[in-house]
Amino acid sequence: ESVDGTTYRRSLRLARGLGVVSVTLSAATVSCALTLDDVADAQAAVQRTRRLLDLDCDPASIRDHLAVDPLLAPLIEKRPGLRAPGHPDSTELLVRAVLGQQVSVAGARTLASRLVAAHGEPLTEPVGGVTHAFPSAATIAGLSPEDFAMPRARGAALIDACAPVPHGSRVRDAGSQRARAVAALPA
């Protein structure tokens, strides 16, 4: 991912290939541009971008529920419509969460950058400093604990979490079947 002025860019791993979403903030709007290996992935890329920006929330309902709390009410009034950022890729989110344990944000960012540089998939067409996609669950599952600059047990946990199971992956994403995901978790 990269940030350049008012534009945030990040790679997307999609069903038919890779892509990059560029989100630009102006005074009144947020615009989005997609660069995709396959245009058939456009709808999925838009859905992931909506999740990233929390565009499907209901700000009025959230305001109504949170504004009754005396501590939250002044904050809600000061920043109405504020949204909680999401993440477009649950595998990447899981890996980044584990990488961030017991290290600083800068340290976690460095570990993630090294992982992408060593094991990420190069984009067909780099966009604004984004050159690689985050490694897939299958790629991470194929690594050894020593490939991570962290304690061996944490690296092994990452590999296990990304390892395939008979009916898919332990990693849940939008559209995952909950019962199958729960059944796939280790005891």
Question: At which residue positions do the language-model features occur?
Answer:
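HhH-family (HhH-GPD) DNA N-glycosylase catalytic core used in base-excision repair
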Residues: 1-187
